[in-house]
């Protein structure tokens, strides 16, 4: 049996009439009208998240880039980021002409707070917290440390739509929250992203820089005074979202709660099953964290490199694509592959974790019976790998 764990859910039927209408009109550009689908998406997403403002753009990476530019940091300023994230995050920092500083990440996939505090020096001008694969670092400590030094915090919540921390929605804790609409995320437009903030100056700067040229910022329905002071003073990066993408996302907003709930159900059912084996460890979330996962990560305990490779090979034979972050050639989540950075930092915990951390997509559309079968295949693959290595 082979499980297709990469195909997304179908776009809800309610989007189809509006898609047909826009295909007939050809009106794909967001600024052709006052209340375009992109504008409506921004309003609806902000309301859903409890934020004052939202800006939809071409990707989560674009949202992070624009957010960093909007902070008006000096060129080359240092930005603290986790050592475990997707390559797009340090890339966005570099794109904003800033310097990433990587924090060591523990075996539970969350930032090591001792290393975070040690590296939060006077040279650090901003922090990007990547909730990688939906795992939330200690936001209470992060915010307390950063607030004490007046350092802005940006949340990369690409994997964390639907997650809460002490009941507060992830993406609303820092100064800015950035989300993804890429196909493997909770909301699927193929590509796309959105940022949220309560800061009027931040939203004005990001709107203009996203490509609201001339006076197109007026179509966002916000205070003219704030935008007026930035008119013609900021570069235009043209990272706008199209109306077609916005229609796809708007139709899925009503699915967020259900997908988050079902994703957590599937994750916890599989975690409970495979954690019965002493060779597999599924780190528990931090107490304030209520997750909305669409994948599962687990660690191989006391495995050699050969045994780890044998396990992933056995999983592939069984029809499930389990991968190990650090053992995939060129994996974009392994910090030593970010060769566009100057030098490779010493992150011993992160390196050790990546060499034994397994990754498996677990879409919310799966049934509990399918999840149970996947668990059986993981456990049987484990035994098969152990037997092969012992032979």
How would you describe each model-predicted region?
Residues 160-166, 173-295:
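Active-site region of PLP-dependent enzymes
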Residues 214-225, 269-272, 311-358, 387-390:
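Conserved PLP cofactor-binding pocket of PLP-dependent enzymes
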Residues 1-70, 74, 147, 355, ...:
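Conserved PLP-binding active-site segment in aminotransferase class I/II-type PLP enzymes
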Residues 108-189, 194-202:
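Active-site phosphate-binding strand-loop segment of PLP-dependent enzymes
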Residues 286, 293-304, 333-342, 355-369:
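Conserved PLP-binding active-site segment of the aspartate aminotransferase-like
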Residues 65-119, 128, 315:
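Conserved PLP-anchoring active-site segment centered on the Schiff-base-forming lysine
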